[in-house]
Amino acid sequence: MKAHAGVEMQASVEPHRNEPSASGHAVRLKTLVIGLGNPLVRDDSVGLRVVQCLAPALAGREDVDVAEDYWGGLRLMERMIGYDRAIVVDAICTGAPPGTVHVLSSDALPTQRSASAHDVNLPTALAFGRQAGAHLPPDERIRLVAVEAADVLTFSEECTPAVAAAIPRAARIVTELLQTLPGDASP
């Protein structure tokens, strides 16, 4: 795989394609569902909690991988290598009422989950990865399911009540996106 400015990227995994399986049915595209957050910061943990809620229901699906991470930007882009679609679940602060669930396209992704000023936002990271030759989902196959946070500063392992109440709704939205996000070639 090409590298840029001394950054080595992991080789891409060959993903599932829209090719007939042995049974003649189209194979679903490989999808990453990844929750972002800090498990020790109140509402910042909501992305992790949503994917933890989803993991048992998605465990039997060979076309979906469920993951957790604490970083956005370049690290998130690297986690997407080899996938055809991605759903990122995270907290967001836009001023909407706490617990509001937003669905954003990749060009609107504000995520900058980085403790370093040396990282970039996800759209920039995706552009970098594609330029370096990484197999990444196209923008139209990436969504952010973002839960409006009330408190992203307090150390606590519990979300605020409004955000905790939004977890099942966010999980349902992720499940719906798995069925409707472009590229689903299931029979």
Predicted regions and their residues:
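Phosphate-binding/catalytic loops
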Residues: A125-P187
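Residue-level signal for pocket-adjacent positions within structured domains
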Residues: G35-L36, A96-G99, A115, V147, ...
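Nucleotide and nucleotide-moiety/phosphate-recognizing core
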Residues: V27-I34, P39-L109
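Helix-loop-strand module that forms the ligand-binding subsite of alpha/beta enzymes
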Residues: A91-I142
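Generic structural signal for well-ordered, non-membrane alpha-helical segments
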Residues: P39, D43, G47, H118, ...
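Intrinsically disordered, low-complexity terminal tails and inter-domain linkers enriched
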Residues: M1-R28
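Short, contiguous clusters of charged residues that form electrostatic/catalytic patches at enzyme active sites
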Residues: L48, Q52, L74, V120-A127, ...
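Conserved short-loop catalytic and cofactor-binding motifs
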Residues: E14, N38, V64, R113, ...
